[in-house]
C-alpha cells in the first residue's frame, strides 16, 4: 500500500491550519431587528439581472446592503457571489450565463451581523449562441487557493481541496461530487469524511460537508475478527490514523444511490518486519444526495486478499523489495461500481500490488455475490475476491497502476487506469473490451488482462502551456455523462513541486473537469483545458489558421510535457513545428482536423485558463498512427 502510506504521512507533514471553527459570520437572521424583502427582478438580459429590494425595522444601524447570488446554492451568502446595492437598494448582477437560473438573496449588514431575505429564483434570458460566445465570461476562481484553503472558508472552495473525485448526476439535476479525505493543510479534518459538493453547471460548486462523521462501527471489529483468525492480537491503532480514500458513487435507480468507499487501516500486521495492515471497502446508501446527512452505512464489502497464506514477513535485503515482499495479491481500495448491459452489478478495485480485480455484486445488497472465505490462502482459496482484469506486468506484485474507472459506451466497456505515483507522475490510460471481464485491449493491441503490459493510449499526463506553471498528478478519474451525449472526465490536478512563493505547492489539489470526445474508432480523448461552459459555436476553418501550442503527450515518468509552436497555413500546409511539411484538412461538421502524417485531432471550444484575463479559445486532443497522444491550444 505504497500509495496510501506515503501520501497519508505526507499530508500530515504539511503545516496544519489552526483556529478552524464554524464561527463564520455570514449567516445571521436570528433575532434580527430588521426585515429584508425578497428581491424583485426589474430588468433582465442574457448576461445580467437587475434586482431591487427593501428593508424595514431599525434601519439606522445598517452600514451595508447588497445582493448575493449563486447558480448552485439555494441560500447564497456573501461568501458566494456578491454585488453592492445603490442608495435605492438596487443593483445589476452582470457576467451571468444565458438561460440559467440563479438564486438571489438581498442582505444588509449592521450591528456586526448580516441579515438576509428569502431567496428569489430568477432566470436570465436566452441568447443566440454567437452572442453567448461574444459575451462569454470565464470562471474567476483562483487556482492558487491557499488564501481560502482553511476550514472557515469552505463555502468559497468551489473545486479547491479535491482529490480522487467521483461524480454522479442525480434526479434533482445536480451533479454531486465526493472525494478522498485530502486537502491543503488538512483543512478537511474539521468536518468528517468523504466530503461532498454539488453543481448545476460543472463550473460552480457548492460545498456540502462530510457524508460520514466517524469511523464506521464495523471497521475495528471486522479488523480484529480477521486478526484473530490469523493468530494476531487485536489492533491498538488510533482511530485518528485510519485513512478515508477514493469513494465511488453511482445512481442505481431513482431513489437509490450507492457510495463504495475505502478505509485504510494503519500500522503493520505484526510489528517491525511484517507487511502493512489491510484496507477495507465499505458501502453507504442514500435515497437523495441532496440530504448530505442521509448516507446510511451498510457495512463491509471486501478486504485485501493474499495468496501467500500467513507468510506476511518481509525480507529487508530482498533485491526487489516491494515486489518480493508484497503480501497481498489484491489491495482493497479504489472501487469502481458498474451495472452491465445485462443488469448485473460489478465492482472493479485495486491499487498497486498485482493489478485490478473484478468481482460480481448482489443487486439487492450491493455486497459481493459469492461467499467470501478467509482473505488468505492459496490463489485458488481466494478466488472469490476477484479475477484479474488489468496488470502492467504479469506476476509483478508491486506495479504503479490503480484507480480503475469502469464505464460502458457504444458497445465497449472502457477501463480507465491511473499509472505511477500520484504526487507528480500520475497519468491516465484506457483500454476496452466487449466483455466486462475482458480481455481488455489497448489501442496498440496490448492485452492487459491475459498477457499484461502497458496500456495505451495516454489520456492525461503532467503538462504545461506557455505562461503558466501547469499541472501534475492528473489522474484517478471519474468518467460520466450528462444524459444528452456529452461526456466528462473528472480528476484532481496538483501544482508542481516548489512553485515559487507557494508553501508546499504540490499539495494544492484542484478538482478538474474536462470534456471527452470519442474518436471515429471509438476511443476517448480528453481535452487539455478544463471545462468552463464555453458556448460551442461552430469552429470554422479560417479560425484554425495561425500558431498553436502543441504538446506531444508521450509518456515520460514525472516530466511535465511542454508545448512547442505548430503553425497551420492557409494553403493547408504545416509550416512550423514537429509536423512541418505535412498537409491538413478540416471537417467542420465533425470538428476533426486531419494531417496526412496519420494524426487526427478533435477540436473543441474551451476556456483559456492561462490567459489573463481568462477567455475562450480552441483546443484539440487526438492521436497519431503511432498511438501517441497530442494536446494543443490556439495561440492568441
PLM feature spans:
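C-terminal motif of bacterial Sec signal peptides marking the signal peptidase cleavage site
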Residues: 16-19
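Positively charged n-region of N-terminal signal peptides that target proteins for export
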Residues: 1-5
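N-terminal leader/targeting segments
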Residues: 12-14, 426
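Carbohydrate-active catalytic/glycan-binding domains of CAZyme proteins
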Residues: 23-25, 126-636
Amino acid at each position: 500500500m505504497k500509495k496510501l502510506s506515503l501520501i497519508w504521512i505526507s499530508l500530515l507533514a504539511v503545516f496544519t491550519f489552526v483556529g478552524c471553527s464554524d464561527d463564520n459570520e455570514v449567516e445571521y437572521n436570528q433575532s434580527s431587528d430588521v426585515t429584508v424583502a425578497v428581491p424583485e427582478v426589474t430588468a433582465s438580459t442574457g448576461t445580467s439581472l437587475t434586482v431591487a429590494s427593501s428593508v424595514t425595522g431599525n434601519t439606522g444601524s445598517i452600514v451595508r446592503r447588497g445582493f448575493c447570488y449563486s447558480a448552485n446554492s439555494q441560500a447564497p451568502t456573501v461568501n458566494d457571489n456578491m454585488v453592492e446595492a445603490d442608495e435605492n437598494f438596487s443593483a445589476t448582477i452582470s457576467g451571468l450565463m444565458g438561460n440559467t437560473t440563479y438564486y438571489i438573496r438581498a442582505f444588509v449588514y449592521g450591528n456586526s451581523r448580516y441579515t438576509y431575505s428569502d431567496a428569489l429564483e430568477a432566470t436570465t434570458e436566452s441568447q443566440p449562441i454567437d452572442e453567448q460566445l461574444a459575451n462569454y465570461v470565464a470562471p474567476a476562481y483562483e487556482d492558487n487557493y491557499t488564501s481560502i484553503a482553511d476550514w472557515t472558508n469552505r463555502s468559497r472552495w468551489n473545486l479547491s481541496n479535491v482529490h480522487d473525485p467521483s461524480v454522479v448526476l442525480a434526479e434533482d439535476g445536480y451533479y454531486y461530487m465526493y472525494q478522498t479525505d485530502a486537502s491543503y493543510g488538512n483543512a478537511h479534518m474539521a468536518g468528517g469524511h468523504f466530503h461532498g459538493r454539488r453543481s448545476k453547471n460543472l463550473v460552480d460548486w457548492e460545498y456540502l460537508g462530510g457524508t460520514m462523521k466517524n469511523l464506521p462501527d464495523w471497521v475495528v471489529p471486522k479488523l480484529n475478527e480477521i486478526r484473530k483468525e490469523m493468530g494476531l492480537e487485536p489492533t491498538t491503532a488510533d482511530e485518528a490514523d485510519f485513512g478515508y480514500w477514493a469513494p465511488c458513487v453511482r445512481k442505481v435507480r431513482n431513489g437509490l444511490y450507492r457510495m463504495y468507499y475505502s478505509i485504510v487501516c494503519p500500522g503493520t500486521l505484526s510489528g517491525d518486519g511484517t507487511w502493512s495492515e489491510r484496507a477495507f471497502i465499505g458501502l453507504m446508501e442514500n435515497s437523495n444526495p441532496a440530504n448530505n446527512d442521509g448516507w446510511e452505512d451498510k457495512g463491509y464489502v471486501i478486504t485485501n486478499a493474499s495468496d501467500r497464506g500467513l507468510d506476511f514477513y518481509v525480507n529487508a535485503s530482498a533485491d526487489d523489495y516491494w515486489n518480493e515482499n508484497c503480501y497481498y495479491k489484491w489491495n482493497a481500495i479504489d472501487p469502481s461500481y458498474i451495472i452491465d448491459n445485462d443488469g448485473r452489478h460489478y465492482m472493479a478495485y485495486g491499487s498497486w500490488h498485482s493489478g485490478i480485480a473484478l468481482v460480481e455484486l448482489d443487486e439487492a445488497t450491493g455486497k459481493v455475490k459469492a461467499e467470501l472465505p478467509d482473505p488468505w490462502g492459496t490463489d485458488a482459496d481466494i478466488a472469490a475476491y476477484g479475477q484479474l482484469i488489468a496488470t502492467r506486468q504479469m506476476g509483478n506484485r508491486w506495479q504503479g497502476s490503480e484507480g480503475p474507472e469502469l464505464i460502458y459506451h457504444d458497445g465497449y466497456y472502457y477501463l480507465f487506469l491511473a499509472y505511477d505515483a500520484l504526487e507528480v507522475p500520475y497519468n491516465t490510460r484506457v483500454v476496452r473490451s466487449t466483455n466486462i471481464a475482458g480481455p481488455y485491449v489497448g489501442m496498440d493491441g496490448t492485452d492487459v488482462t491475459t498477457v499484461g503490459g502497458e496500456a495505451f493510449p495516454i489520456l492525461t499526463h503532467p503538462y504545461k502551456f506557455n505562461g503558466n506553471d501547469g499541472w501534475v498528478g492528473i489522474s484517478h478519474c471519474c468518467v460520466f455523462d450528462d444524459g444528452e451525449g456529452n461526456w466528462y472526465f473528472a480528476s484532481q490536478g496538483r501544482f508542481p513541486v516548489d512553485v515559487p512563493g507557494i508553501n508546499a505547492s504540490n499539495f494544492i489539489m484542484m478538482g478538474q473537469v474536462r470534456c471527452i470526445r470519442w474518436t471515429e474508432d471509438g476511443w476517448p480523448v480528453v481535452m487539455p483545458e478544463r471545462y468552463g461552459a464555453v458556448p460551442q459555436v461552430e469552429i470554422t476553418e479560417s479560425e484554425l489558421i495561425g500558431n498553436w501550442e502543441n504538446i506531444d503527450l508521450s509518456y515520460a515518468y514525472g516530466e511535465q510535457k511542454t508545448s512547442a509552436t505548430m503553425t497551420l497555413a492557409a494553403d493547408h500546409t504545416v509550416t512550423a513545428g514537429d509536423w512541418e511539411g505535412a498537409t491538413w484538412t478540416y471537417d467542420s461538421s465533425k470538428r476533426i482536423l486531419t494531417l496526412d502524417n496519420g494524426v487526427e485531432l478533435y477540436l473543441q471550444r474551451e476556456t483559456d485558463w492561462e490567459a489573463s484575463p481568462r477567455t475562450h479559445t480552441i483546443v484539440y486532443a487526438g492521436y497519431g498512427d503511432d498511438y501517441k497522444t497530442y494536446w494543443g491550444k490556439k495561440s492568441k
